[in-house]
Curated annotation (Swiss-Prot):
This is F420-dependent formate dehydrogenase subunit alpha. It comes from Methanobacterium formicicum. Catalyzes the oxidation of formate to carbon dioxide, with coenzyme F420 as the electron acceptor. In vitro can also use methyl viologen, 7,8-didemethyl-8-hydroxy-5-deazariboflavin (or FO, a hydrolytic derivative of coenzyme F420), FMN and FAD as electron acceptors, but not NAD(+) or NADP(+). Optimum pH is 7.9 (when assayed with coenzyme F420). GO terms for molecular function: 4 iron, 4 sulfur cluster binding; formate dehydrogenase (coenzyme F420) activity; formate dehydrogenase (NAD+) activity; metal ion binding; molybdopterin cofactor binding; NADH dehydrogenase activity. Keywords: 4Fe-4S, Iron, Iron-sulfur, Metal-binding, Molybdenum, Oxidoreductase, Zinc. Dimer of an alpha (FdhA) and a beta (FdhB) subunit. It is an enzyme of class 1 (oxidoreductase). Binds 1 [4Fe-4S] cluster. Binds 1 molybdenum-bis(molybdopterin guanine dinucleotide) (Mo-bis-MGD) cofactor per subunit. [4Fe-4S] cluster binds at C10, C13, C17, C45.
Length: 684
């Protein structure tokens, strides 16, 4: 019996837990957490523990598929390549779009965006950060000059106070949740603000329920109190920031009493948490999708930055603004330039000098300076007939994007559609060509977690059938389409990473030898003698002048508000046992724990509607309706209902609003849309 242990990184959330894949007879039969790994320290959440169950499933894609007369047939790689190459070459580049995969290693994503830009000639490149932490990238870049988490996870344990807003870490990021609980055990005061009384909120020293979508008003009122009480860090503000007087003027009108009317948080409670946050020597802000997934998500993110700068809680252990990122490599996907506005390393597409530098490095011709379309814009353009061809790698927008009917309409309206994935997803069913890809356990490369830690993943087993690495597929297609072979010839993922270092300044000092250790390296790491950067903005911010920028912001509220026809606000969330659906619902152990969805409804709302616990109800919005079981609970604010987003048979995204978009980031408003709930016909 031949058993080996292959160290790698979990493929689910952005925490980046280390694990060993247990391989027996060339199959992955289990996982063991790394005991020495600095992130998870010998622990894993349920998703990590059972991630191996999807690797050898019989429904893995193993050969290219081409749709003819509405049915898929098996095809050779050459057939598939010829068809794809002919279609990509037949349309104007502006009529073609790419969704990159934030689950995929950095090396795959880098080659994907390079192929789209050089070979196809389009900046219509995006990935799922648009639907989770796009506002983080835009908001923190505007405030601090860098759109990423400021501190490391380990830093939480040095905090005196932790303010968690819009983050249910014990379910969505359990091993970060563990560090927060350890901080609390060390004496940190733990405040949780959330419309739902989540498992994380139940561990708080102080829980603040508030009306979804009113984060700006809540934090403006907190800053009003801090300034009124003279608790702002005057020295930090003077030496390290600008635009303070403009901020002060705006927040002056947001008294706690005014904010109470907006947020439903009592004025005395707002005063209390503001003073506690300001008086703490080291206070950390933690947030996640409850902050970002709004039509004013960038404003929410910039408010967290305002609050931290106002009190000098930046650049020290136990402080900072700490977004908990979504997918395992969503940070890396942003770093690699899977964005319509940015090349690798966040260098701007619109900057002529940047474009000239990139073309010189890559050895290609003019790439143009017009930014491309974001994911919601590509979906809209496809629905209108302006986007003709779409190439999706490892994304499932039929499940994950808002307004499912709109997404399906858009996909049906395409002239040509390619999906590259490991399973026949709900989205892949719409495709003209489906290509089989290797999963994370079947390849080498790097993932970058939410704290900017770049970590190696290692191949444990061969990919099934004729599956290929994503980077290999794009290189094959590039050559098929006549690209210079030297631009797309790599022997390994390591070769690609060496090129990444030349175009991504934050990664310049990293090499395999330095990454081949449990602690790996945090970016920015500009040279090989640089130790990496676990904590950012210690002496200056990343703006050219080194100053942080206060952003005065007014409360906007959700774009869609309740009315007589749709009197409730729907928010959507994630569960401990699921991620999206394509993988976790195929992991038998996880799917058995929560096999289908439900709608959480406040006890008073349920009583007014005559709805009993577990009763099947109809939930309706302006975009569609679903049938789903009710879960009657006191753990959610009256007037708000919640549906987990994982379940196709009762999909929350049939209800969500694709038209409610954050103008600063393109983020759809998953956390607030108006719905009505009614009893099913014939129910008692």
């Amino acid at each position: 019996m031949d058993i080996k242990y292959v160290p790698t990184i979990c493929p689910y959330c952005g925490v980046g837990c280390g694990m060993n894949l247990v391989v027996k007879d060339e199959k992955v039969v289990g996982v063991e957490p790394w005991k020495r790994h600095p992130v998870n320290e010998g622990k894993l959440c349920p998703k990590g523990n059972f991630c191996y169950e999807i690797i050898h499933r019989e429904d893995r894609l193993t050969t290219p598929l081409i749709k003819e007369n509405g049915e898929f047939r098996e095809a050779t790689w050459d057939e598939a390549y010829d068809l794809i190459a002919s279609k990509l070459g037949a349309y104007d580049p502006n009529e073609i779009g790419f969704f990159c995969c934030a689950r995929s290693p950095n090396e795959n994503i880098y080659v994907n965006q390079k192929f789209a830009r050089i070979v196809v000639g389009t900046h219509n490149i995006d990935h799922c950060a648009r639907l989770c932490h796009g506002p983080t990238v835009a908001g923190l870049a505007a405030s601090f000059g860098s759109g990423a988490m400021t501190n490391s996870y380990a830093s939480f344990e040095d905090a005196d106070l932790i303010f968690s807003i819009g983050a249910n870490s014990l379910e969505a990021h359990p091993l970060v949740g563990r560090k927060l609980m350890r901080a609390k055990m060390n004496g940190a005061y733990f405040i949780v603000a959330d419309p739902r009384y989540t498992p994380t909120a139940k561990q708080a020293d102080q829980y603040i329920p508030f009306k979804t979508g009113t984060d700006v008003a809540l934090m403006n009122a907190m800053m009003n109190v801090i300034i009124s009480e003279g608790l702002e860090d005057k020295e930090f503000i003077e030496k390290r920031t600008k635009n303070y007087e403009e901020l002060k003027e705006v927040v002056s009108k947001y008294t706690p009493e005014m904010a109470e009317e907006i947020t439903q948080v009592p004025a005395d409670v707002i005063r209390d948490i503001a003073i506690k946050y300001a008086k703490a020597d080291k206070a950390a802000i933690v947030y996640s999708l409850g902050i970002t997934e709004h039509s004013h998500g960038v404003d929410n993110v910039m408010q967290t930055a305002n609050l931290a700068m106002l009190t000098g809680n930046i650049g020290r252990l136990g402080t900072g603004v700490n977004p908990l990122r979504g997918q395992n490599n969503v940070q890396g996907a942003c770093d690699m330039g899977a964005l319509p506005t940015d090349y690798p390393g966040y260098r701007k597409v619109a900057d002529q000098e940047v474009m000239e530098d990139v073309t010189c490095t890559w050895g290609c011709s003019d790439l143009g300076c017009e930014p491309g379309l974001k994911i919601p814009e590509m979906i809209d353009a496809a629905a209108k007939g302006d986007l003709k061809v779409l190439y999706i790698t490892g994304e499932d927008p039929v499940i994950s994007d808002p307004d499912t009917h709109h997404v399906e309409e858009a996909l049906n309206n395409l002239d040509f559609f390619v999906v590259q994935d490991i399973f026949m997803t709900d989205t892949a069913e719409f495709a003209d060509v489906v290509l089989p890809a290797a999963c994370w356990a079947e390849q080498e490369g790097t993932f970058t977690n939410g704290e900017r830690r770049v970590q190696l993943i290692r191949k444990a087993v061969d990919a099934p059938g004729e599956s290929k690495y994503d980077w290999e597929i794009f290189c094959d297609l590039a050559k098929k389409m006549g690209a210079d072979p030297e631009m797309f010839t790599y022997e390994s993922a390591q070769d690609i990473f060496e090129e990444v270092r030349t175009v991504t300044p934050q990664y310049a000092g990293m090499n395999r030898e330095r990454l081949d250790r449990p602690e790996a390296l945090h970016w920015p790491c500009p040279s090989e003698d640089h130790p990496g950067t676990a904590m950012m903005h210690i002496e200056k911010f990343a703006h050219p002048d080194g100053l942080g920028i206060f952003m005065p912001l007014e409360e906007q509220g959700p774009m869609e508000t309740p009315d007589d026809e749709y009197p409730l606000i729907l928010t959507t969330t994630r569960l401990l046992f699921h991620y999206h659906a394509a993988m976790t619902r195929r992991a038998a152990t996880l799917d058995r724990e929560v096999p289908t969805g439900y709608v959480e409804i406040n006890t008073e709302d349920a009583a007014e509607l005559g709805i009993a616990n577990k009763e099947k109800v109809k939930v309706k919005s302006r975009r569609g309706e679903i049938e789903i079981a009710a879960r009657v609970t006191d753990d959610i604010v009256k007037g708000i209902v919640n549906i987990p987003m994982h379940f196709r048979e009762c999909s929350a995204n049939i209800l969500t609003n694709a038209a409610a978009i954050d103008p600063k980031s393109g983020m759809p408003e998953y956390k607030a849309c108006a719905v009505a709930i009614s009893k099913m016909e014939g129910s008692k």
